[in-house]
UniProtKB/Swiss-Prot annotation:
A GO cellular-component term linked to this record: host cell nucleus
Record keywords, A-Z: Activator, DNA replication, DNA-binding, Early protein, Host nucleus, Phosphoprotein, Repressor, Transcription, Transcription regulation
One annotated GO molecular function: nucleotide binding
Gene that this polypeptide is encoded by: E2
Chief location bin: host cell
Superkingdom of this protein's organism: Viruses
Protein name: Regulatory protein E2
Subcellular location: Host nucleus
SUPFAM superfamilies with a match to the protein in the record: E2 regulatory, transactivation domain (SSF51332), Viral DNA-binding domain (SSF54957)
Organism listed in the record: Human papillomavirus type 50
Length: 396
């Protein structure tokens, strides 16, 4: 802006930008380039309004001006959308047909945020399995997201009993809506039924104290038009909630506990045979942190248990913002793969005393021994605004 600007010249420029926007709206274009031009015009319009308000003008033309902070925020939103659209335009999906509504601020801010979406469909949830106690959620046939390297990917929007999510090309599944928090508000039993695309997913929860990630019985609706491949995708893997991990169902929990008891029994018998051979001794430095199975629950003295648990693998728990942790995980996995044994996806605690999907995410990193963990901390810099805690697990 120059000092020569007057209210009349600003009004003319302001109205010119509005004319550009109206022409682009009436054009009803499916070309992404036109939508980039639209948001560029929006940015210029809001910059003019911001400047005029700062110059103590109350209106431009016949239009009253909002507070300067409102125009400033709208200008920032326009810049954000314009930059994202320009990046999308250069990707493999820039030549696809796009409507202006698919490139709107409302669509960009709708869950999952900062992703473009196409072809919305309704997912109806019956809380307490009551047809009169329902709430509609919106999922999308296609979701466009950027990875850690700002590359765009096109994936399917998926639905399961836990919520709405999409599966990244890395295999990680990201929930952008969980039903369990709403079930505690709008329901009493902790049960709900999910209905979408002529398909019904029934909860098999028998107690209100069950986890939100309990098992579900899926039944097709009256139509057979449901895409089976989508069912396979939504039922495969271990989805994480923006919230990156899914706790096991009751059935898998039973199998896990039974398997753990069998491992404990086998491990105890194996250690007992070693004891009979004179192997009942403290772990050597090389053995510390090397164990990958569970210490026996019974039959060990306190000293013997301490000796056995000394072999448990050491871990680090890193806590911080989810996207930062995911980017950091990708970087160190590419460069320092020899400094750790394995690493989890980003995950969050759930439960009445946690912040759920609004809280910080965590990464769990396991090591061969404490020396390797120390080497990792000394070599790999932690991302900003993160904390770490040390610990051991009795098995991996």
């Amino acid at each position: 802006m120059t000092q020569m600007e007057t209210q009349e010249t600003l009004s003319a420029r302001f109205l010119a930008q509005q004319d550009i926007q109206l022409n682009l709206i009436e054009k009803d274009s499916k070309n992404l380039k036109d939508h980039i031009d639209y948001w560029e015009s929006m940015r210029k319009e809001q910059v003019l309004a911001f400047y005029a308000k700062k110059e103590n003008m109350s209106r431009l033309g016949l239009q009253p001006l909002p507070p300067a902070k409102v125009s400033e925020q709208k200008a920032k939103d326009a810049i954000r959308i314009q930059l994202l659209l320009q990046s999308l335009y250069k990707s493999d999906f820039g030549s696809e047909p796009w409507t202006l509504s698919e490139c709107s601020l409302e669509m960009l801010n709708a869950p999952p945020r900062n992703c473009f979406k196409k072809q919305p469909f309704t997912v109806t949830v019956q809380f307490d399995n009551d047809p009169k106690n329902v709430y509609p959620y919106i999922c999308y046939e296609y979701i466009y997201y950027q990875d850690d390297r700002d590359k765009w990917h096109k994936v399917k929007g998926l639905v399961d009993h836990n919520g709405l999510y999409f599966k990244e090309v890395t295999g990680d599944s990201v929930y952008f809506k969980l039903f369990q928090p709403d079930a505690t508000v709008y329901g009493k039993s902790g049960q709900w039924t999910v209905i979408f695309k002529n398909k019904t997913i029934h909860s098999s929860v028998t107690s209100s104290s069950r986890s939100a990630f309990g098992p579900a019985d899926e039944q097709p609706g009256p139509s057979t038009s449901y895409d089976k491949s989508q069912q396979e995708r939504s039922g495969s893997g271990q989805p994480k909630a923006l919230q990156d991990t899914e706790p096991p169902t009751s059935t898998s929990t039973v199998r896990l506990r039974r398997g753990r008891r069998e491992r404990e029994h086998h491990s105890y018998r194996h250690r007992k045979s070693q004891s009979e051979l004179g192997a009942d001794s403290a772990p050597t430095p090389e053995e510390v942190g090397r164990r990958s199975h569970t210490v026996a629950a019974h039959g060990l003295s306190r000293l013997r248990r301490l000796q056995e648990e000394a072999r448990d693998p050491p871990v680090l728990i890193i806590t911080g913002q989810q996207n930062n942790l995911k980017c950091w995980r990708y970087r160190f996995s590419q460069k320092y793969a020899d400094l750790y044994e394995c690493c989890s996806s980003a995950w969050k605690w759930l439960g009445p005393k946690s912040e759920g999907y609004r809280g910080d995410a965590k990464l769990l990193i396991a090591f061969k021994n404490p020396e390797q963990r120390l080497s990792f901390l000394n070599t790999v810099g932690l991302p900003k605004n993160t904390t770490y805690s040390m610990g051991h697990l009795d098995s991996l």
